[in-house]
Structures are given as C-alpha cells and as structure tokens.
Amino acid sequence: MANQKIRIRLKAYEHRVLDESADKIVESAKRTGAQVSGPIPLPTERTLYTVIRSPHKFKKSREQFEMRTHKRLIDIIDPTPKTVDALMKLDLPSGVDIEIKL
C-alpha cells in the first residue's frame, strides 16, 4: 500500500470518549509501523434548540438546550497491511461515529 493515506474522522457528543478512541487508533497504527498525523481537533458543532416551557401559553417563558458534536481527524500515511488489520480488529465505544476514507 505505497503512497496511500487513510483519513479517519471521529465524531462524538462526549470529548473524553472521543479522545480515548483517537488515542487507541493512533497507538495501534504506530505499533504496526505506520506514520500518523493527528489527532487534529476540528471545530465543535453546536446545535441550539429553543422550546416553550409550558404546553399552552406563556410564550415568553422558554428553555434552551444545546447539543455539541466534537470532531477529530487522524491521517495514517503509508499504512501497512498489518495496520489495516489492527484497525479492523479495534474495539471502540458505541458513542463514537467513525468515518474512514482511503
């Protein structure tokens, strides 16, 4: 797999779980002899929801909820077949969304 790059984007609502997953990926890639760039923190997405507190009236009384999506980017440069196998066998938490591009 010469001159190839694997780009991994991680998304999660909790940044601690996200950082632990990124560390696991970087550690397993370095252990198999690949060069790793990252984890690079990407901008956090902040979604704000405003709802009326009461079911019928009092429109001035509102409540706001926010949802933050934390993101990280990891580039694995010149991966070996061992690197790909190690990444496939890696067990990561279910709260982390993983997007892999070759």
Curated annotation (Swiss-Prot):
SMART domains in the record: Ribosomal_S10 (SM01403)
InterPro entries attached to this UniProt entry: Ribosomal_uS10, Ribosomal_uS10_CS, Ribosomal_uS10_dom, Ribosomal_uS10_dom_sf
An example Gene Ontology molecular-function term: structural constituent of ribosome
GO cellular component: ribonucleoprotein complex; ribosome
Disulphide bridges: none
Any one biological process term the GO annotation gives: translation
Keywords: Ribonucleoprotein, Ribosomal protein
Entry's family note: Belongs to the universal ribosomal protein uS10 family.
Purpose of the protein: Involved in the binding of tRNA to the ribosomes.
Assembly notes: Part of the 30S ribosomal subunit.
Entries under NCBIfam families matching the protein: PRK00596.1, rpsJ_bact
Entries under HAMAP family matching the protein: Ribosomal_uS10
Stated name of the protein: Small ribosomal subunit protein uS10
Species of origin: Limosilactobacillus fermentum (strain NBRC 3956 / LMG 18251)
